[in-house]
Amino acid sequence: MWKGNRRQIDEDFFETPRWAIDPIRKYIPSGVRRIWEATYGGGAIGRVLTEWGYEVVATDKYPKTAETVQHDFLADPLVENCDMLIFNPPFCLKTEFLAKACETGKPFLFICPVTILETRTRFNLFREHQLSVLNLPNRVNYDGGKETEKKKVWFHSVWIMKHPDFKNLILYA
């Protein structure tokens, strides 16, 4: 279960800006057609994936758009009819989301603060599942492209990747 209702009341809801999404395009494996965006939020990532020609399965525990299906990634059964997962998880639950993404057995990409590399638990997940890191060149302001004074959340961020052709690597966007 997600901790409290922080995401529901927007305390842990930070959309990814376009410039931070664009570098992942070349890391989507060939043959992928249907991508599950398990934390769809307002659709920042999903809109880009749709623009690139992918079918997006939009789910979120707290839907914010009409096209989003209510689904708790950590508690509900997995969406089976997808080729890959791409998402921006609640940062307070990055370890749980990493573990669950690894359990799916599917390729995935998810963006989070570089602190994902810390702790023995996450270290073991990286090693066991041969995960790679796509390092972004600048800190990310998670405002979804909507610059506001209210929400300026800057992190040095990375994309965590499970990919059949990229294993145990640090890549640079």
Predicted features, each with a name:
Residues 1-173:
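Class I S-adenosyl-L-methionine-dependent methyltransferase catalytic core
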